[in-house]
Amino acid sequence: MAGRRVNVNVGVLGHIDSGKTALARALSTTASTAAFDKQPQSRERGITLDLGFSCFSVPLPARLRSSLPEFQAAPEAEPEPGEPLLQVTLVDCPGHASLIRTIIGGAQIIDLMMLVIDVTKGMQTQSAECLVIGQIACQKLVVVLNKIDLLPEGKRQAAIDKMTKKMQKTLENTKFRGAPIIPVAAKPGGPEAPETEAPQGIPELIELLTSQISIPTRDPSGPFLMSVDHCFSIKGQGTVMTGTILSGSISLGDSVEIPALKVVKKVKSMQMFHMPITSAMQGDRLGICVTQFDPKLLERGLVCAPESLHTVHAALISVEKIPYFRGPLQTKAKFHITVGHETVMGRLMFFSPAPDNFDQEPILDSFNFSQEYLFQEQYLSKDLTPAVTDNDEADKKAGQATEGHCPRQQWALVEFEKPVTCPRLCLVIGSRLDADIHTNTCRLAFHGILLHGLEDRNYADSFLPRLKVYKLKHKHGLVERAMDDYSVIGRSLFKKETNIQLFVGLKVHLSTGELGIIDSAFGQSGKFKIHIPGGLSPESKKILTPALKKRARAGRGEATRQEESAERSEPSQHVVLSLTFKRYVFDTHKRMVQSP
């Protein structure tokens, strides 16, 4: 029986200078092409500028062997026959704040996250942002307290215990509550120390990682999609693209598309950590060799089965606000949108279910176009500032929820400043990367799933009218007087210049309980006639009678003067008119619609 190798991706994330690259190097036995600060700029500055990859292998633990489905392990050329191995691929993500785009790209291919903390400094800004990304994109966490060699020997254990308690408290309100925390010294003495200095705690860390790892569910079906992080040429062979398979599978001789360039190439050969293979599937990290392709055209990006990705100009996404982000998410605001392997600016419009559907079960993998949605001036959340939530009138005008009642699911229309190529149902992260990187604030604003991409450049005309997002409009006026038992005159609902003909046929409610229908304009001053199909109640007539009596007593010769006087006469108490209607945001005819 050939040896088998199961691949699991472990992300190494944390603040700049926390020792992530040194830790990955200490853990690794095999370095992949993109590993360990290969970029000259990165080596000079001592920070990781791109995703570095390396790996180590251990015998597959017995607890994982028994549950291993046959299709989840890929045959390899070199392991000892019959000895299945667990290959841990380490994804070393940069910790520099301005490179958060790269971190987000890396987190999407990670099965378990190692959060590296400098034990002398504790939780820092980028550590917190990495933790936020981990909560979105990852299920398991191991916290590594690095640089314990810098702690005074006599106080070392006390300092480690103190930081462990701090981290446990930090994780308490996250999905990673109770995650294991382990102290190490990846490179005792720091970067300048001689290589002879042995790392501390690495065997224990490997043991901990092995105990925490579970074999991810891998699915070879579906279209092939690979996240490419490095591209280079080999003389006489061709161009090699290295990366991790996000979905599907691939075999020798298959055709792949580089969607950003609209180029299709045939797979000539494949390698996984320097070992030739004939096929690979979701979760595997490999290099694909193609011919006649300039590696300079693609440093990072996506490679896929031909025509399986779409390029979109806008998208409908589900939205969930990141609680650590300060401030509201407002309609018309611009955010950095990370989708697929790209980060572009996008303008957002938020919307929610209609108020009656606020408690409906969230649908995570599709968008229902037959349903009506309520426009929102901003994402609804319980942490809105009092200045916003106290303004009930503004809330009503926008049709927003008051008293902290929030819908279980919300969405946004994102309009990208330039088209993006991405898979369907992919992760979307919105952030404010232009915020000051030195302030101690979370720049990650929201996350969600891309539910529907709009590929037509003219989507505003061809698609958006299908999207039934409405604003709820409320107008209030007064009944000036009754004309007879079945009609009244209203005022103060419209401006003088309003074309009242547009509102004819709309229903209004009187504060006395009657239902009326706008019948016609009355004069030129914005007044209008309302028909009351059920007639005025005796109580309403009593309120509105002063004007009727005055008109009845008026003599013929004084008709005009008395009519003017009657118009000025007020009822004994105000009767308020309420007009409520929907206006659909993308209706080109701007029609007003009322519920039956």
UniProtKB/Swiss-Prot annotation:
Consequence recorded when altering R285N: Abolished ability to mediate insertion of selenocysteine
Enzyme Commission number(s) from the entry: 3.6.5.-
Taxonomy, superkingdom: Eukaryota
Keyword Magnesium: no
Reactions catalysed: GTP + H2O = GDP + phosphate + H(+)
Cofactor(s) for this UniProt protein: Mg(2+); Mn(2+)
Compositionally biased residues, Basic and acidic residues: 555-571
Cross-referenced Gene3D superfamilies: P-loop containing nucleotide triphosphate hydrolases, Translation factors
Residue numbers covered by motif Nuclear localization signal: 547-553
Known function: Translation factor required for the incorporation of the rare amino acid selenocysteine encoded by UGA codons. Replaces the eRF1-eRF3-GTP ternary complex for the insertion of selenocysteine directed by the UGA codon. Insertion of selenocysteine at UGA codons is mediated by SECISBP2 and EEFSEC: SECISBP2 (1) specifically binds the SECIS sequence once the 80S ribosome encounters an in-frame UGA codon and (2) contacts the RPS27A/eS31 of the 40S ribosome before ribosome stalling.
Protein name: Selenocysteine-specific elongation factor
